Amino acid sequence: MTKTKPAPHRVKMHVKKGDTIQVISGKDKGKVGEVLRTIPSHSQVVVKGVNIRTKHVKPRQEGESGQISSYEAPIHSSKVMLYSTKEKIASRICYTVTDDGRKVRMLKKTGEIID
């Protein structure tokens, strides 16, 4: 009987697609970019202009030359922090309820509402 691989522990993501974030650790520390895609099953995000990798693509047809393409690889969501474009500062978030009863994300340092 073969063993099945357990599903990775899923943690609620604090960022969503389209958010502006800043990288807080790693080789791309300090870079600001937009979240292109989230991968909740692995707690990872793909950020525009961050963690660029190169891939060598073999030629598909005869006579065609190979090429080198670059793409954004995913990084762990714990390495990013939401970024305020108005104040130019990264901040943690908290969840708060507005007067009309909506639950929204708010930056702790600036009080700016994200959603």
Swiss-Prot record:
Cross-referenced InterPro entries: KOW, Rib_uL2_dom2, Ribosomal_uL24, Ribosomal_uL24_CS, Ribosomal_uL24_KOW, Translation_prot_SH3-like_sf
Any one GO CC term of the record: ribonucleoprotein complex
Top-level taxon: Bacteria
Keywords noted in UniProt: Ribonucleoprotein, Ribosomal protein, RNA-binding, rRNA-binding
Pfam families (UniProt xref): KOW, ribosomal_L24
Keyword Amino-acid biosynthesis attached: no
SMART domains for the chain: KOW
CDD domains: KOW_RPL26
GO BP, sorted A to Z: translation
SUPFAM superfamilies: Translation proteins SH3-like domain (SSF50104)
Keyword Magnesium: no
One Gene Ontology MF term: rRNA binding
Family: Belongs to the universal ribosomal protein uL24 family.
Primary role: One of two assembly initiator proteins, it binds directly to the 5'-end of the 23S rRNA, where it nucleates assembly of the 50S subunit. One of the proteins that surrounds the polypeptide exit tunnel on the outside of the subunit.
Subunit-level organization: Part of the 50S ribosomal subunit.
Cross-referenced NCBIfam families: rplX_bact (TIGR01079)
Protein name (Swiss-Prot/TrEMBL): Large ribosomal subunit protein uL24
Naturally occurring in which organism (per UniProt): Synechocystis sp. (strain ATCC 27184 / PCC 6803 / Kazusa)
Gene behind the chain: rplX
